Amino acid sequence: MRAHLLHCELAFSFGKYFYSTSFLNLLMINLMFSKLGAIFFLNLALYLLALALFFFFLFNVKVALLKSVSQIYYFNNIFFFKFFVLIFFLNLAGIPPLLGFFLKFLIFFFLFFKTNLAFILIFLGFNMATLFFYLSTVKSFVNRKQASVLNSFNFFIRAELSFLYFFNFFYFFLFFAFFFLDSTFLIFLNLFF
């Protein structure tokens, strides 16, 4: 039972990166302009596949036996673990040779012909913000001091979580409001919030 609870806590700490504002922004943009088209389903399917593969890997590595996040640096000796985590987070961030970049490029290309420059700049700004979070997570896996600092500053981690959850709630609101509101109004909301 204790191992299961620790595993759930670790999954919860990783959860903030999977449901990022960038991903919700991508879903909202896809729904607004493609009207539940093929790009939306491709994007959703590939993100869910990446998420499922990552959790499958975590279950098989028995990360549930860890007592805290700072002990994750013990896996630094396992090259495959570091490589897999690095590729996973870079894929979610949308770094060019990976599939996550291809999906973001499709959406960016579609936005280029459908909207104005301000909306594209907001989209790129959210992508840069999530890239910072993904790269700082990868750095904490490699750097032993930073991994131990994560346990020392739980208050700051919780503040960051609450900030991200607020934005996730806001984008879920916009995501579901699409079905009830005109898409022009949603673009107006996204430009000012």
Curated annotation (Swiss-Prot):
E.C. code: 7.1.1.2
The reaction(s) this protein catalyses: a ubiquinone + NADH + 5 H(+)(in) = a ubiquinol + NAD(+) + 4 H(+)(out)
Location in or out of the cell: Mitochondrion inner membrane
UniProt keyword annotations, A-Z: Electron transport, Membrane, Mitochondrion, Mitochondrion inner membrane, NAD, Respiratory chain, Translocase, Transmembrane, Transmembrane helix, Transport, Ubiquinone
Domain of life: Eukaryota
Assigned GO CC terms: mitochondrial inner membrane
Transmembrane segments: 18-38, 39-59, 83-103, 116-138, 161-181
Top class in the EC scheme: translocase
GO molecular function, one term: NADH dehydrogenase (ubiquinone) activity
Coiled-coil boundaries: none
Membrane topology, record value: Multi-pass membrane protein
Stated role: Core subunit of the mitochondrial membrane respiratory chain NADH dehydrogenase (Complex I) that is believed to belong to the minimal assembly required for catalysis. Complex I functions in the transfer of electrons from NADH to the respiratory chain. The immediate electron acceptor for the enzyme is believed to be ubiquinone.
The protein, known as: NADH-ubiquinone oxidoreductase chain 2
Species name: Paramecium tetraurelia
Gene of this entry: ND2
